[in-house]
Amino acid sequence: MSGLILKLGPKERILVNGAVIENGERRSRLAIMTPDANILRLRDVIHPEDAKTPVRRACYAVQLVLSGDATANETKHALLRNIEELSQVFVDMDSRQLIDTASGALSRGDHYHCLKSLRSLLPREERLLAVRN
């Protein structure tokens, strides 16, 4: 089995190419076989008013592509700039690896994995901002 594997909880919703799909009563596992399908877990959605930090803004931009509200071409250059800026702030090795993974995924047009890597930076960003305040 190849492709993206999604593990869904009961009643969890996902957006697949613009269609909202809700899981049933039990946990399930889905294999997405179409390589360029746009997938977004609705539990992971960042609302526009919450996109106030650099990582959240980058996540939100990727999310717009996955939801179909923006095209990959419209966001690619701005996202690459955002990711480059993040690489100047997050200098530890683990964060750099996540940033490199996000950048590589974006270059391949793999927005799902780009978002996944960027979301992994959110707790680190929160810690940095907490120290600053």
Each model region followed by its residue ranges:
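Short flexible/disordered coil segments
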Residues: 19, 25, 73-81, 129-133
